[in-house]
Amino acid sequence: MGVVLFHLFGDGRVSGGIDVFLAISGFLFTGMLLREAAEHGHIRITRYLGRLARRILAPAALVIAATTAAGLLILPTTRHDQLVAEARASLLYVENVELIRSQLSYEAAGPETSPFQHFWSLSVQGQFYLVWPALVLLAVWLARRTGRSAAATMSLLVATVFLGSFLWALHHQGINQAEAYLMSGTRAWELAFGSLLALLGAHLRLPQPLRTPAAWTGLGLVVSCGFVLDGAALFPGPWALWPLLGLALLMAAASAPSRTADRSPVAPPPIRFLATRPLARLGDLAYGLYLWHWPALIIHLELTGAEGLDAGGAVVVLVFSLAAAWATHRWVETPLAKWGAPTGTSGTIDAGRERRLHRTTLSLAAGTLALGAAAGTVHLQLTTTPQEGGWATEGLDRQVYPGATVSASSPPGHSADDDVAPFPDLVGMSRRVPEYATRDCHQRTGDDPGTSEVLLCEDPREPHDARLSIMLAGGSHAGHWQHAWLMLAEEHDWEILVATKGGCVFRHIEDHEHNQCGAWNADFAAMLDQRQPDVVVTPGTRIPRDGGEESIVDGAQDRWQEITDAGAQLLLVRGTPRQLTNVPDCLASGGDAHSCAPEVDRFAETDPLEDAELPAGTATVDLTDVVCPQGRCSAVIGNVVVYRDSHHLTNEYVETAAPLLEEKLRETMPQLFDSGDTGAEEPPAEGAADRMTGAQRGDQSR
């Protein structure tokens, strides 16, 4: 319940409830499996899987089906491919893996957040349920061979899992916090913690005077966690022990209640409070409430168009989720539980009925999982991009889809045929990234330790002795022009390199230790001395993502000076217009090319680079009129979609803009083109460095 309340009323803060949930899962299942294995020498796998299917998979499958149907009806078509992928992943209990694969970190709810994001923790739990029986059987087998008790052997194995996973979580947090938060390997220690509570329960008994203080302390630790700690940044590291130790204290306080004068057991007040009928009833609905609340929240935000949830919206989502959880418990969970429950005075299930029950349950489970796998196959077939192995615009009719080269006398979005659908298709747009981003050489956004390393993307074409080496560097806005540069490179014998870090522009930052962008800037200077490109191309201005006017980033000139001091020619490109909302989503939701366009008034009246103090020899190029012809921005130009999200250009539009980029470069940097090129103003000199004139390069030398 705490997880739900923090999601709805706490701006999505991590409450620690998931950590407690995982520990309780380990507590309950370890004890149950160990008792069965010790008694029978094995685990009745069909009964075990059938019980899981009835109690866990069936309600989850219902919510997944309902969420998928609602999402396909309500969410923009641009999000359908990811929706189906995550529905399949949730059904197969690998949603945490899908979120990592898709580079979607755990975050507070917003208009573009996945409605299946909360299934990551259920996926960790489901993977535990499939793996843990093998560990229990191993413990029983080892116990019989060594003469030790199964509980003692299991305790040793679980302690090993706990220690290994805890150390792995600690290590991986320093590499990638977003992945560490979602990975099963870094979460296993929390499940092992609960398992150890089950195995060592007999040793958790507290002296009577300590039980009530321990219960209050434990409850305080669990409840306060979400208010005190930033779980999204700290978990599953050592700070996750905060709520887990609270759980341990509560269990220790409840394990042996105090007794009155007549020897009647009396639990400490916090335990009695948690066992009251209303809370017990709410506990019956907890699983369904958790399943329903997140998709209800995301659908509510989509329907209302809100960026976040206010108090009124939170109440609406909570009431709906409670009603849906009650209905699920009443008509799904309870009937399935009764279906598999023992009957008759003996408390056992008739053997024939048990076999039919298990066959039916497992058939339903297998069918559900097969459906998930089939959905994934269809999804992959539908969303495979056609640009692999060639240009995104290869074979495109440029008469129908002129893109950026549409006639200057035509309005933005002009088409020879008004009925022509924009290119490319909006579905899967977010995955149509530039070529370099498909390789493991783009440094990710954020301040996770280890993200300061400069990763260099080599030219994707066959190695050759290029006439000039040109490096696109800085944030991703430098990289999204890659395809246009590659097109020109084929014609003019250039080598195109890319060195980017998401969200990081060139600027001077003192605190390198705690700011990975600052450290990346410093490392870039060292890399520049080693690689020595002839030209470095980087954005010169920036429009803040949360509003504000275009400007030069503070401290950028210092880094630009370092680049020219290293002997490279610097080319500054004016920043790309930015929209506050996702452009393909806007188009898919019924918006037109004008209403979904970036806000042109966020541009400075004149290019800030014109009056700025720049390093000697720096060249500048303004591509604003390429993205916003005639001073008017549009989401679709020449029947080609301009943006793949709110601020990155599509590969397709960038490729149509290559001729316009060449025109601009011939005006600004004619020395890039050799004497054989039309429009060249001077013959080439010997050596790549000598091709830069003194006027462009300034007084610097290599």
Where are these regions (language model features)?
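Membrane-interface helix/loop caps of multi-pass membrane proteins
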Residues: 1-358, 367-369, 679
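Extracellular/periplasmic envelope-modification machinery, especially enzymes
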Residues: 231, 304-308, 322, 330, ...
